[in-house]
UniProtKB/Swiss-Prot annotation:
S-adenosyl-L-methionine binds at T59, D84, S123. Coiled coil: none annotated. Pathway: Quinol/quinone metabolism; menaquinone biosynthesis; menaquinol from 1,4-dihydroxy-2-naphthoate: step 2/2; Cofactor biosynthesis; ubiquinone biosynthesis. SUPFAM superfamilies: S-adenosyl-L-methionine-dependent methyltransferases (SSF53335). One of its GO terms (biological process) is menaquinone biosynthetic process. It is an enzyme of class 2 (transferase). One of its GO terms (molecular function) is demethylmenaquinone methyltransferase activity. This is Ubiquinone/menaquinone biosynthesis C-methyltransferase UbiE. Its EC number is 2.1.1.163, 2.1.1.201. The lineage of its organism: Bacteria, Pseudomonadati, Campylobacterota, Epsilonproteobacteria, Campylobacterales. Methyltransferase required for the conversion of demethylmenaquinol (DMKH2) to menaquinol (MKH2) and the conversion of 2-polyprenyl-6-methoxy-1,4-benzoquinol (DDMQH2) to 2-polyprenyl-3-methyl-6-methoxy-1,4-benzoquinol (DMQH2). Keywords: Menaquinone biosynthesis, Methyltransferase, S-adenosyl-L-methionine, Transferase, Ubiquinone biosynthesis. Belongs to the class I-like SAM-binding methyltransferase superfamily. MenG/UbiE family.
Amino acid sequence: MQKQEKIIEMFNQIAPTYDKANRILSFGADVAWRKKACQRVMSLYLKKDLKIADIACGTGDMIEIWQESALKMEKNILNIKGIDPSSGMLNVAKEKFPNVEFIKAGAQNLPLESQSLDILSISYGIRNVVERQKALSEFARVLQKDGILVVLEFTKREKGGFIAACRDFYLKNILPSIGGIISKNKSAYEYLPNSIEGFLSKKEFILELKNAGFEMLDYKSFSFGVSSMFIAKKL
């Protein structure tokens, strides 16, 4: 089994408990991070009528937050799609949001027309994409000119110190144990800190975005550097 297939199968296995684990392990902060990202994009992008796709959508958390943010910011979502390669995750998403279109596909091969989207989001998923540069090129392809890409991700820390040490201790020692109890799959939650350590720094990822045809509009770090928000415009 190839690396990408193993990652997808891991998410299939933890899908039934994924939402519960996320809320507990992040102390609910992941919802706040997503809301801030969606509202920031809505404030930057002036169009009122929007076509949105959420990539690596998982169980659909961002779908709901996009809908709530559009209502709050007086925007109109013409179409919103959730795309994920995990059938387990999509099964949960479809139960939660029966009126939303969900598509089984990987980020590196999107079944979407070129220049068909205003906004594309991917939350805590880009580090799980093996062919990351290919995925970023796909994001550029399906976005309209001046369309917005928003990425939420756990990036490799660039600084040391007490807070960084606490973060590392939690990720490597506490999170896998709690996640394992909730999901009965400890190895899946041991993968999380390893995948963060194997990912890019903020500067490295911004360079990849530029190389894929994007211009950075905004960056923000949440919760002492635990989570990063990247907002970029397609050139």
